[in-house]
């Protein structure tokens, strides 16, 4: 059943709840530590503080029966910067494919590095980006392209549709990537 209200934007979301008390307390403590010469630490390790990595393993993964070593956990400053930075290891002339709708950063990061081509007037789409429609007709799961695409952004659970892929559905994409290596 379609929603009774118009959809305004399916891009970057907006928070709906205030920060939890534990976060506020931790931020205040960190600010106090940064304000004193005795407790000031400067920049943290680029892979994340050991205490944070251990806490992630202990409190997030271990209760679900998932076991990681600290070297397998990477702490970053958010998806946007990592999504943008991954392009640094890719070729400038790689072709790009995105699900549509898509988290805007996947396109924006390719625009900034010159990989997206020319913005087509009227459509708002980029000439060197293959848009793979995700609609109710295909259960918001894109078709495997019939041409080679060098970089395909798959984000599941999908933002903004919430769709997930099964292992067999993901295997189709792995097979596509291997066939187009």
Residue ranges and their predicted role:
Residues 32-33, 38-180:
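Conserved core of the PLP fold type I
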Residues 1-33:
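Conserved N-terminal helix/loop that builds the PLP phosphate-binding region
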């Amino acid at each position: 059943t379609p929603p009774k209200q118009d959809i305004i934007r399916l891009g970057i979301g907006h928070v709906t709840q205030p920060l939890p008390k534990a976060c506020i307390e931790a931020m205040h403590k960190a600010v106090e530590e940064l304000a004193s010469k005795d407790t000031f630490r400067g920049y943290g390790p680029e892979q994340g503080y050991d205490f944070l990595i251990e806490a992630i393993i202990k409190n997030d993964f271990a209760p679900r029966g998932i076991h990681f070593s600290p070297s397998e956990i990477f702490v970053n400053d958010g998806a946007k910067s990592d999504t943008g930075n991954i392009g640094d290891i890719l070729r400038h002339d790689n072709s790009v494919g995105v699900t549509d709708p898509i988290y805007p950063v996947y396109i924006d990061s390719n625009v900034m590095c010159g990989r997206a081509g020319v913005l087509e007037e009227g459509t708002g789409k980029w000439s060197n980006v293959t848009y793979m429609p995700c609609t109710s007709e295909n259960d918001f799961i894109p078709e495997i392209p019939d041409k080679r695409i060098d970089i395909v952004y798959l984000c599941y659970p999908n933002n903004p549709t919430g769709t997930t892929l099964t292992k067999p559905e993901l295997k189709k994409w792995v097979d596509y990537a291997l066939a187009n290596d």
